[in-house]
Amino acid sequence: GTNAGGLNVVRYGTTRQLTLGLEVVLMGGEVIELLSGLRKDNTGYDLKNLFIGSEGTLGVITAATMRLFPKPVACSTAFAEVRDVSAAVELLHRVQAASGGMVEAFELIPADILDVLYEYFPKIPQPLATIGAMNVLMEIGSTNPASNHVDGNGNTPIRQIMEDVLAAAFEDGLVIDATIASSDAQRDALWDVRETAPESHKLAGKVARSDVALPQSAIADFYADMVAGIKAIDAKIRICGYGHLGDGNLHFNLV
């Protein structure tokens, strides 16, 4: 398989970070037993990381020992229009600091993605009144039951964290508009936007796909340079460069 990360990579890591051991069958039929359950193993070479990411070229993975995490019992999900990509990166840092590292997901969603999405899936609710040029979908989660305690104002501690961060970011000009889910149904609706976007790209026409990994500090300049260069070649190309901002992984797709 690949060293995939997925939507929650910012909190839990990539496949290599989550895999403690493997069983692999080589091309000649030999079985390699690497099913250690240890988080730290100082013995010999770490062969499992050669197989993870090789996509079957070195052998077939037939079993795996995985690291597991407690499921969050409380979460707060928000969709925000941000000033630009650099503002999105700064917002991520603020949410991480305010929540004590509880960010479950932080997804970059530009306007082109939403334009394509609503062409083919108009029934999906728009998170905000207007479509902003650059947006983020973010979620924080906690395994502490107290984080879900409703106070006299109908608020929870984890939601208060999100509200405070967004309010400060709005005052500082990082955030233009935002909404926080108040129910599971509203949370699901926000996630529908992100999870349906790839399907809309397929319907829109030919898609040039890429999977780019960058340092967070380089994302804003990369995005600006790529947009300028591509638009100079063909202004009609829609740039659907969404992705996991938390680990610097962008699916910089062109439609």
Residue ranges and their predicted role:
Residues 1-255:
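Noncatalytic alpha-helical scaffold of FAD-dependent oxidoreductases
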